[in-house]
Each structure stands twice: as structure tokens, then as C-alpha cells.
Amino acid sequence: MSNPTSTPRADGFRMPAEWEPHEQTWMVWPERPDNWRNGGKPAQAAFAAVAKAIARFEPVTVCASAGQYENARARLDDGNIRVVEISSDDAWVRDTGPTFVIDDKGDVRGVDWGFNAWGGFEGGLYFPWQRDDQVARKILEIERRARYRTDDFVLEGGSIHVDGEGTLITTEECLLNHNRNPHLSQAEIERTLRDYLAVESIIWLPNGLYNDETDGHVDNFCCYVRPGEVLLAWTDDQDDPNYLRCQAALRVLEESRDAKGRKLVVHKMPIPGPLYATQEECDGVDIVEGSQPRDPSIRLAGSYVNFLIVNGGIIAPSFDDPKDAEARAILQRVFPEHEVVMVPGREILLGGGNIHCITQQQPAPRKA
């Protein structure tokens, strides 16, 4: 495995859209008791359900610690799911795993961004995070893929979405937050994104979803469904703290053009809830110094936008909410050639994210 000192763009690589063919999807097995209630057992059942749903469409590799390997292997009893032993600090592989890039000659490489647990010592969610910062490298070594490392640039995969044709969507709330890359200007951040993902146009939404503890990851708020079309979390309730965020994002999207000069078509996705953790759910989480405590009075950042596109399928969260059926119908309408599979997402949400956050697609090699 090589470690190029150049950039993906200079070497002819780009980040593909999520709907381009996958070789597999990666996940990490949850166990951290100060984030996942009841020793992680309810979350493990939820992750297993997601893995098995994905495995209907493509191979899945789940990374588990030495202490959880045997348990994970037993619970993931599907021939299309591989379990490998990798140590980590938590289970958010979208943010800790590599961002894969491809060229037109059949090669796949990975970008290994710096990781600081969503803010380091200024708002980060736990410490230490060293093992999480090593996850991308370990995955790339297992796959024997070349690795581009950005030691001086922090980024989480959930903070970006691309259309595969030169346009990236992100949020100012996250990427311009002083707890990520305070030494860089917006222009310098854009230059890094262009160099490592081979994008031309960057659309900056002001904020992500209200109370998203990642500082507003775009993958919980707005995503591409095809070139020129996006899906935006939405509420018409003017008393909802998300209302102004949705309105501001819509204005930016309607005024933007992508790298191909297209105006964007915006599809609206209702926001579930409002959703809250119960006192019992919060009491099941260990209280540990350096970790974020759970509070039943704080609204959860639930979103149907936090889904994964797989080969021929859409794996999306449900919340036992009246809007679940509408969300499924919208996803089926915007993805008419995919099968929409809804998987219970509450346990994942209680930990701070959802299906897109706990998965990382590895694109299939392609030749022009």
C-alpha cells in the first residue's frame, strides 16, 4: 500500500456519487457504554438490522473490537457480511473511515482525513479519539488501497455530499467551525476540497439540522439524489427551530448553480417528531468524564435524509412516527429504480446519528 504525497485530483481521481456502483459497504460495531445505552446491546441489534438490509444488495464488512468480535460474528449471521477485527473509539465510520476516490483506469484509493471527535477539546464528543483517527488507515491497509493522508486538515465524511459531476454541498456551521480547522480560511478549505475530491463548485448551506451534535453535518439535512436534484429536510412549522434553517438552505439552493451550470431541483422531506430520548433511555448510558451526557430535555436531530444509497436499494431510517409512510413514499418517488427498505433508526439516533452516519460505501473500480 502506497502513501502518495500528491493529491487525488493531481493523480486523476475524484469522489464518486453515492449512487455509482459499490464494491461493498463498511460499518463499525457499536459498544461504547458512554454513548450506547445498556452496554450497546440495543444499538448492536439496530446495527445488525442495517447490515443485513444492506447485505441484500451488496457485500458488507463490519469492523469489531477484539472483545466484541465473537459476538458481532454471531449476530451478523449472513453470508454476505464479513467481520474483521479493528479497534476503534466508536462506531461512526462515515466520519472515521476513508473517503474513497476513483479514477477512469480501474483504481480505487482513499482519503484519510484528520479526525478530532467533532471538535477536539472545543466541543468534541469524547476523548481520546486516537483509535478512531486510525480507522481509515486500517481499512485502506486491509483493502491494499493507496492512502492520501491530510494530517493538517480535519474533516468528517458526513459533512459533505457530492454529485459525482463536480459539485459538493456542505454547511458553514460545520466546516467553518473554529473547532475543526481554525488555521484555514474558507478559500483554503475550498482549495483542499477541490484538491482531494476533484470538485469544481461548492455550495455552502448556512446550517445543518437543529441540535445536531456534529455541528450541522449536511448528511443529516440535505443530500443529492441525482445530478441536479437534492433532497432537503423540511418543516412548515414556524415554531420549529428548524424552520429558519430550512428556509435559509432553500434560498441558497434555489440561487445556486452546480458545476455543470444547472439550477437545482429541490425535493422536500418532512422532519420527524419532534423526537426526544426518554429518561430511561438516558439512564442506560454510562456517565464518563470527557463524554457527552444524554439529556431527555434536548431534542434529537432525527432525519429521514440520513439514508444510504446501495446497489439497487435505499436503506433509510424509520422512527415509529406518523411521517414514516410519507418519507418512504418520497424516497420511492425520487428513487424509482431502487427498492426502499426502512430500518428502525431510533437506537442509532439515540447515539447521535443514523444510517448514513454508520456506513461508508466503497465504490467499485471502473474503467472509462
Curated annotation (Swiss-Prot):
Q: Which InterPro entries match?
A: Agmatine_deiminase (IPR017754), Peptidyl-Arg-deiminase_porph (IPR007466)
Catalytic activity, reaction form: agmatine + H2O = N-carbamoylputrescine + NH4(+)
Which is an annotated Pfam family here?
Answer: PAD_porph
Superkingdom classification of source: Bacteria
Q: Which UniProt keywords apply?
A: Hydrolase, Polyamine biosynthesis
Q: Where is the active site?
A: 357
Its pathway, per UniProt, is: Amine and polyamine biosynthesis; putrescine biosynthesis via agmatine pathway; N-carbamoylputrescine from agmatine: step 1/1
The keyword Zinc is assigned to this record: no
Specify whether Hydrolase is a keyword of the entry: yes
Give any single GO term for biological process. Answer: putrescine biosynthetic process from arginine
According to its UniProt record, this protein's enzyme class is hydrolase
Q: Per its record, what are the GO molecular function terms?
A: agmatine deiminase activity; protein-arginine deiminase activity
Enumerate the SUPFAM superfamilies for this protein. Pentein (SSF55909)
Enzyme Commission identifier(s): 3.5.3.12
Q: Which NCBIfam families match?
A: agmatine_aguA, PRK13551.1
Described purpose of this protein according to its UniProt entry: Mediates the hydrolysis of agmatine into N-carbamoylputrescine in the arginine decarboxylase (ADC) pathway of putrescine biosynthesis, a basic polyamine.
> Which family does the entry's similarity section mention?
Belongs to the agmatine deiminase family.
Assembly and oligomerization: Homodimer.
Output this protein's name. Agmatine deiminase
